[in-house]
Amino acid sequence: KPLARGYAVKYTDAWCATFVSAVAIKCGLSDIMPLECGCEAMISLYRSHAVSRWEEDESITPQPGDVVFYDWQDSGSGDDRGAADHVGIVSSVSGRVLKVIEGNFSNSVKERTLEVNGKYLRGFGLPAYYTKTDNKEDFDMDINEARKQLTSCADTGDTPSAWAEEAAEYCKRKGIFNG
């Protein structure tokens, strides 16, 4: 279910979009990556964003740091226009193979491998990284460091990474997680 901005996320909520937003905040990219806790609402923000954009064509080859949206009800017979159910961040691209870091993948942070234009792809959020090339971020990152951080913020094991623990504590202090 889509949830509005300003919504205090609960532990029982799906948290894939919240994860993408938390990574964007941690990397100082909230001005080019729409922040939201629901997939469809995040797509709406990409569609109306001043510099970043929504790409409906799931056959494009995204770049590391782009945001991929899924529709688990996709039949695989043509362009999918259903509601997005899940979201992650492209971590690497090799030919037509994508690796995507996802929060709420079996209730943890993991990496998924899939093909460009594969079944379940809904579309892509394309952050305007080019606007960051001459600017320093809140965390003094240049564009290359921002992309590196964005695509490496996940721990694929069962033990939470130090970053995940720090992010969780931050979210609790700021009231983002509401028990």
What spans do the regions from the language model cover?
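Soluble non-cytosolic domains of exported or imported proteins
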Residues: 10-18, 56-62, 158-162
